[in-house]
């Protein structure tokens, strides 16, 4: 007999506005506890220094978190010029100070260098692993290990303002882009050094900025529900985004109850207009209930890749 999961079977995505000073895992565990969720996972860590958009997947939505991890991101970053640190942010030790002396044209030429497709060497102060251990652990021990440059793409790099020694930029980039590394490299190109003093993630995939909620807002709703002796889900669940928003960029294939039954049992089915070599979003019937994602197999049939478990909601 299957063991009953601890917590509530709740599915959806919380678009959390993470505060500074907390780890992404700490934020994840807080949200999981507030929702009393049986399962939860985030979609790519934000540095403790950083604030902003951190999608938290609950329940069956965790099956599609990789799609958000792979999605484009957008950041607002403020760099302090003239000072370089060992971590490329304000948490690190100052390693060099230099005068600031560049023209507006030199700044624009430096920014242009980072636009488009480039190769980036990850910072030693990152969570990437080398021989099973995060790079930042080697860095804290004063060790430097080899890192391979990785391809990244900066879709947009917009100048926002320059006030004194503080430069603010808006960056729309591909997954795996280290904003601290861009900031450090930019500082070196300008000949003065730089480090991040403010970093805010303003976008993940196509999620709307105004749908974010803070931990304080969630905890206030939980407290209100308890005070009014109401089920917390009445106040908390309306804030959840549907789990299929994680794969909203995929082509939709709508199937009948009969075909859905075959798919849910792991069997491929024949459908029309199935794209080649692309994942698709599978919906059911006129209500277009999301049932998962699939892909064309070698026989030209729609094969299930990752399906949701449809269950009755628990209190």
Curated annotation (Swiss-Prot):
The active site is at 47 (nucleophile). It comes from the Bacteria. The keyword DNA-binding does not apply. Signal peptide: none annotated. It catalyses: uridine(55) in tRNA = pseudouridine(55) in tRNA. The keyword tRNA processing applies. Keywords: Isomerase, tRNA processing. One of its GO terms (biological process) is mRNA pseudouridine synthesis. Its EC number is 5.4.99.25. GO terms for molecular function: RNA binding; tRNA pseudouridine(55) synthase activity. InterPro entries: PsdUridine_synth_cat_dom_sf (IPR020103), PsdUridine_synth_N (IPR002501), PUA-like_sf (IPR015947), PUA_sf (IPR036974), tRNA_psdUridine_synth_TruB (IPR014780), tRNA_sdUridine_synth_fam1_C (IPR015240), TruB_C (IPR032819). Responsible for synthesis of pseudouridine from uracil-55 in the psi GC loop of transfer RNAs. Belongs to the pseudouridine synthase TruB family. Type 1 subfamily. This is tRNA pseudouridine synthase B.
């Amino acid at each position: 007999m299957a063991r009953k999961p601890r917590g509530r079977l709740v599915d959806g995505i919380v678009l959390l506005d993470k505060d500074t000073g907390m780890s992404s895992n700490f934020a994840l565990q807080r949200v999981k506890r507030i929702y009393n969720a049986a399962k939860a996972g985030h979609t790519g860590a934000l540095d403790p220094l950083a604030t902003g958009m951190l999608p938290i997947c609950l329940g069956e939505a965790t099956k599609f978190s990789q799609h958000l991890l792979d999605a484009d991101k957008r950041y607002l970053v403020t760099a302090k010029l003239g000072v370089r640190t060992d971590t490329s942010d304000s948490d690190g030790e100052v390693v060099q100070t230099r005068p600031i002396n560049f023209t507006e044209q030199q700044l624009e030429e430096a920014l242009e260098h980072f636009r488009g497709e480039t190769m980036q060497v990850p910072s030693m102060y990152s969570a990437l692993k080398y021989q099973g251990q995060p790079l930042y652990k080697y860095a804290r021990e004063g060790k430097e290990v080899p890192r391979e440059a990785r391809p990244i793409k900066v879709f947009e790099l917009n100048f926002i303002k320059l006030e004194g020694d503080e430069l603010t930029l808006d960056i729309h980039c591909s997954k795996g882009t280290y904003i601290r590394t861009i900031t450090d490299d930019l500082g070196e190109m300008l000949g003065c050094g730089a480090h991040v003093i403010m970093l805010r993630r303003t976008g993940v995939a196509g999620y709307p900025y105004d749908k974010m909620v803070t931990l304080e807002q969630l905890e206030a709703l939980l407290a209100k529900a308890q005070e009014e002796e109401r089920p917390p889900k009445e106040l908390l669940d309306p804030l959840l985004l549907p789990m299929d928003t994680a794969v909203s960029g995929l082509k939709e294939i709508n199937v009948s109850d009969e075909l859905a039954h075959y798919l849910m049992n792991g069997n491929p089915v024949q459908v029309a207009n199935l794209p080649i070599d692309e994942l698709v979003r599978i919906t059911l019937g006129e209500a277009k209930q999301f049932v998962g994602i699939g892909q064309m197999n070698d026989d030209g049939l729609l094969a299930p890749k990752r399906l949701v478990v449809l269950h009755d909601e628990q209190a």
